[in-house]
Amino acid sequence: MNLTVLKVGGSQSRHEELPALCAALAEAGKRHPLLVVPGGGDFADGVRRCADRYPLSDSAAHWMAILAMDQYGLLLCDMISGSRPVRSLDEAAPIAGEGRVAVLLPHDWLRGEDPLPHSWDVTSDAIAAWVAGRAGSDRLVLVKDVDGLYDAAPASPDARLIDEMDVSRLPGNGGVDRYLAQALKEAACETWVVNGRFPERVAQLLTTGATRGTRVRKG
């Protein structure tokens, strides 16, 4: 069984399409083994506000932000019908194998292995890539609130969607975190960036292997 690791960005929690996305994931999980990695969302934004207000160490902010992912994960687990929270790959495999979505609460696992730099350059994008590498996944899906990666700021009228790119082009692209390229080189999996405000695109990708979005070729 090959797990698809799918990160649901925290930005999804600010849009009314989140329930429809969760319903689509619950349905897709019946046919495709899914491990959902949560973003941080409003929970991580609270950590950022604390870091702006107080002299938090990089390590404190790092672990607080990962605990924020656990919180968002519990929210997603409550909204994805039949899903279960998990804290390791060993817990995820049997749940996904039963046609239910496994939702990772990553703090305990990451705390035990501490595999990534303690920096705001590392977000849930890179964490999801690390998880995909550990799972031996063929595909990582980053669900965001834009159609994919662009050659300029998405709000710019001249911005063009990048349909396909090499992982070497990721550094400097503002749509993902700065550490993602390194994490993907180590994970060696195909990556897609898709818009979760259109749940049908996520379903199409899982079913057919392609949709509107950006495909990042594995390094």
Where are these regions (language model features)?
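C-terminal catalytic "cap/lid" subdomain
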Residues: 1-219
